[in-house]
A protein has these predicted regions:
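Domain-terminus/edge residues, biased toward the C-terminal soluble/receptor-binding domains
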Residues: 135-139, 147-277
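Active-site-adjacent loops and short helices of periplasmic peptidoglycan-processing enzymes
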Residues: 2-156, 162-167
Length: 277
């Protein structure tokens, strides 16, 4: 069939400039709208950052319990952050949680430096990993998603890296599904609590949502990679450049609803009474 006819035309459109819905298990694309349009992705970048950190844990290079000393550069990142101070120490696990839940730029850079020695070296690895995953619409310039010329991806590529992250490291979903949690800052002045509140409002409003990653800047508008699971089916909805936060979450919910209404999970379970004696 001609390229444009392969997929049945969905009965709706989303307001986002790029969107895709993927079955997490098979990788099948269930819906797409401008799925390969190259756009800035803001903090959804951190899906790749988290993937590389989890791979470093997996390979034994670092552990989740390792304590990391925060560099001056990581502490100075600006944007969404948990206000880490230079020379403060925090575990890889707590920093991953802060990246996932509140999109902490300071933690993202500290983790990048821990894994690769510098954010620049880490970014090289991000681009290498993107190429390995077939993310042809993607180029990373930093580990945070802070605005940078030429830092782009597509809705399709977001789904690719999200699928790789959650299929290989499903434990990340225990971080991304945290709605609210305290983490402790320990500095020379003593310890203090910092409350993380998740940036993904679908966690509260969409049944089965397990979070993953939001992103927004004035340039990128409102982006999201959302994972939801119902009846044994896991879907990934990727939305880019929605005009406002409400539309971003509404578009993602519409995609997920469409997917769950289309998906029937076939299992090999034979009803008890049909089994041979």
């Amino acid at each position: 069939a001609p390229a444009g006819e392969r997929m049945p035309k969905a009965a709706f459109e989303v307001a986002a400039k790029g969107a895709v819905l993927v079955d997490a298990e098979s990788g099948e694309v269930l819906f797409e709208q401008d799925a390969h349009k190259e756009l800035p992705l803001a903090s959804v970048t951190k899906v790749m950052t988290m993937l590389l950190v989890m791979e470093a844990v997996d390979s034994g290079k670092i552990t989740l319990d390792d304590s990391v000393t925060i560099s001056e550069r990581a502490a100075s990142m600006g944007g969404s952050q948990i206000w880490l101070k230079e020379n403060e120490q925090m575990t890889v696990s707590d920093m991953l949680k802060a990246v996932c839940v509140v999109s902490a730029n300071d933690c993202a850079v500290a983790l990048a430096e821990t894994v690769a020695g510098s954010e620049e070296a880490f970014v090289e690895r991000m681009n290498q990993r993107a190429a390995e995953l077939g993310m042809a619409d993607t180029h990373f310039c930093n580990a945070t998603g802070l605005p940078a010329e030429g830092h782009v991806t597509s809705a399709y590529d977001i789904a690719l890296m999200s699928r790789e992250l959650i299929s290989r490291y499903p434990e990340v979903l225990t971080y991304s599904s945290v709605w609210m949690e305290d983490i402790t800052h320990v500095t020379r002045k003593g310890s203090s609590k910092f409350t993380l509140t998740n940036t993904n409002k679908l966690l509260r409003s969409y049944e089965g949502c397990m979070g993953l990653k939001t992103g927004s800047t004035s340039i990128a508008k409102y982006c999201l990679s959302a994972v939801a699971k119902r009846n044994g089916i896991t879907l990934i909805a990727s939305v880019m450049a929605a005009p406002d936060p409400k539309t971003r979450f509404r578009d993602a919910a519409a995609l997920l609803n469409y997917g769950f209404s289309k998906c029937i999970l076939y299992t090999d379970d034979v009803p008890e009474k049909l089994k041979p004696l």
